[in-house]
Amino acid sequence: MMPEKRLSLVIATYNRGAKLCTTLDSLLVQTLPQEQWEVVVVNNNSTDDTAARFADYVVAHPQLDARMVLETEQGVSAARNRGIAESRGEYIVVIDDDERVVPEFLERYYSLFESHPEVGAAGGRILPGFESVPPRWMSKYTERTIAGTLDLGDRMREFPEGKFFGGGNHGYRRAVVGRYGGYDTSLGRTGGVLLA
């Protein structure tokens, strides 16, 4: 029998093996003890070397409890739903395959859900990072829209009605996902549609 994990980190990926490995690098220094969390990477039918890169990565970093599952239905919503279905944690945290997280990232989600049983879902800041200078078309408005940056500050508060979490950096209790059925696959990022 597999040991129980309290928190599952779900990462959907499609043809971004190099970026995924950079994301995984940021998980190696998490302050939450490794026995409390797992990583479920969902390969959304990649056609490049993403699966091979991931396999090499987990061999090189056996301390990371990470596995990859395949989702052939294209779209981030279908991929995230598969990751949730394959996960074991009571708390489910979602990030994108190009995000880097701070060392306290998972510990903060874990502590929030453990100490506030009334909280069913939570989200946090996403600060864009660029490999070079930001593209010229990137304004503060497009940065907020594309990166999902909605900064409500450092203290916990109820999420404003009519607002929604950005692409990555949000988490749920498994019971909440079960109650509402996961992500709507008719909205996922496929082709020209940008909602998940």
Specify the residue positions occupied by each region the protein language model found.
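A conserved acidic beta->alpha catalytic loop
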Residues: S26, N43-A52, E99
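Acidic helix N-cap motif at the loop->helix transition within catalytic regions
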Residues: A18-C21, D48-Y57, E104
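Conserved short acidic donor-positioning loop in nucleotide-sugar-dependent glycosyltransferases
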Residues: N15, L27, N44-N45, Q74
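Short, flexible, basic/aromatic active-site loop/helix in glycosyltransferases
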Residues: T142-G162
